[in-house]
Amino acid sequence: MIFDSLTMTQSSLSLLLLTGAIFSISALYLTLFHRCATFSATSDLFLLVPLKFVSRDINDRLKTHYHHSCLGSPFLCIIFLFISPLLNYHFRSLVRPPKIHQKGSIPTLTKNAETRCSHHLKQAAATGEVCKVVVIIKGHILKDCSIFFFIIFPLIYPLFINCSSKYNGLQ
């Protein structure tokens, strides 16, 4: 029983490390190559994930905006599939990408983002355009994840493996 629990815990820690690494690499990839996120310990991570709504009624749009038809990078799909259940993110509002920016370039939101998002949502509901949902991950969560996955976890994981292997040798 104890061996089984140790094996399960070891597998869980390995999965945790893998998902953390995927998240961190994804955030850095988006920041460096797609310019659609800010990765900093003091700022928030803003991701604009393309979503298409099938309903033409604004109330239905608000209810069904979790329907994913992801048109972006595979890294965004990885974040949604593996990382989003683990982090305290929320969908703040819906926006259209500004026309002044080039394709693939998404600006960081300002303090008036929610007002602009509300305006864009109403405008998109009237025109039936493809919207983008803003996923906001707090900067301190990014900082804590980075510290844990790249500093603390590599230090404690070998100790855990060593202890579990010694226990297995006693069996």
From Swiss-Prot:
Parts of the chain that traverse the membrane = 71-91, 141-161
Q: Does the keyword Cytoplasm apply?
A: no
Q: What is this protein called?
A: Putative uncharacterized membrane protein YBR224W
Q: Which segments does the topology annotation call Cytoplasmic?
A: 92-140
Task: Please tell me where this protein is predominantly located.
Answer: membrane
Q: Which residues form a coiled coil?
A: none
The misc remark on file is: Partially overlaps TDP1.
GO CC terms in record = membrane
Q: Does the entry feature the keyword Protease, yes or no? A: no
List locations, semicolon-separated: Membrane
Q: Which UniProt keywords apply?
A: Membrane, Signal, Transmembrane, Transmembrane helix
Note the topology in the membrane. Multi-pass membrane protein
Q: Which stretches of this protein does UniProt put in the Extracellular compartment?
A: 25-70, 162-171
The residues the entry assigns to the signal sequence are 1-24
